[in-house]
Amino acid sequence: MNIREILGLTPIIPVLTIADVAQAIPLARALAAGGLKVLEVTLRTQAALPAVEAIRKSVAEVIVGVGTLTRPVDFAGAGRAGAQFGVTPGLTPELAAAARGARFPLLPGVMTPTEVIAARHAGYAALKFFPAQPAGGVALLKALAAPFPDVLFCPTGGITPGSASEYLALPNVLCVGGTWLAPAEMLEQGDWAGIEALARDACALRKS
């Protein structure tokens, strides 16, 4: 499955920071039960890659990717953990080379027109727009549509349940990344029913 196909499966990709690997399986199951079956686990904790491995082994109904890939070596670790896609906050020649050798498709991050051109030159036409809200949000994505009609985006960063629909209404947006689907307090309390409810609400934002 290529990255466009993966992104097309969901309106919202939960962007997850997992501090305790014991949370990984019930979290993935709760999100999937709520209808969100494409997940991004960020490389921001020591538990991230073990969490991805646990989800791959035990929650077959989800597609799980690894985010915050910032060094070429990160691609190897993500591949060993079983990542089904990767996400970077930006794109360098070194990261592009690592991605070509990876066993999974990449969603590279961009913020400016120059970065869109560079990513497209490297062969990417589905891009993470990051950090979406600080970079210009909906207005900038609208401006990018005319010069880049062949490029689709997954905006991530600063998006809320209240603003997600405005992004999803744009023709050049496939889906959005959301950090609100797994609040730290819910993870600590093991409130999987609450997380499932958040996922169900987010799934209802599906593009028309």
Predicted regions and their residues:
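Short beta-strand segments at enzyme active-site cores
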Residues: 39-42, 65, 88, 109, ...
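Glycine-rich phosphate-binding active-site loops on the catalytic face of alpha/beta enzymes
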Residues: 85, 89-95, 128-138, 172-194
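Shared catalytic-loop signature of beta/alpha-barrel
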Residues: 118, 139-160
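Mobile acidic interaction elements
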Residues: 135-137, 142, 147, 163, ...
